[in-house]
A protein has these predicted regions:
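Structured interface patches
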Residues: 1-171
Length: 171
């Protein structure tokens, strides 16, 4: 359960040990999406009038695309999160980008959108299928991890020809 009644939070803190399924609708607009359910552990408590504080961890796997060969790559995200939620109209928080504003028409605090955002911020931006990935041939597009391609070695850029001649003359 990742949604909480705000009224109960003012009375006591809530400990959370739950999962956020990879099939949850909160991921519908996300790219990348988790490849397994996210493990969510933490504590949610009142932090003042109309304010609530979450601290905990978010952990899960992600399927990515290798930046070199465009094959499948995977990653793991394990991040500690500190989040502040505030009811709309709470003094001093309207313009703070680090505060998640709560819908004043509801008496519910839903952690899922904020946890989704925090997880996405920590997904690796550069994924490799393996450390020694050779990538794709820039000429024919063959995957060099499978084997060498049949392309001829690339001809030198003609703009560098004058420098090549100077180097040969010095020898």
């Amino acid at each position: 359960m990742l949604s909480f009644d705000i009224r109960s939070l003012t009375e006591r803190a809530v400990t959370v040990d739950d999962v956020l399924p990879a099939t949850d609708p909160v991921w519908d607009e996300s790219d990348p999406k988790p490849s397994s359910p996210l493990r969510v552990k933490g504590r949610l408590s009142a932090a003042g009038p109309g304010q609530f504080y979450w601290h905990g961890t978010i952990e899960g796997d992600v399927s990515l695309e290798c930046r070199r060969c465009l094959g499948d790559a995977s990653g793991h995200v394990s991040e500690e999160a500190h989040l502040i939620f505030a009811e709309a109209g709470t003094e001093g928080v309207e313009d703070d980008p680090d505060v998640y504003l709560l819908d004043d028409r509801k008496s519910e605090l839903d952690l899922r959108p904020a946890l989704r955002e925090q997880w996405l911020l920590h997904v690796p931006g550069y994924a490799l299928c393996r450390d020694d990935c050779q990538g794709l041939c820039p000429t024919c597009g063959a995957e060099l991890n499978v084997g060498p391609c049949d392309c001829a070695t690339s001809a030198a850029d003609p703009r560098w020809e004058a420098l090549r001649k100077l180097r040969e003359e010095k020898r």
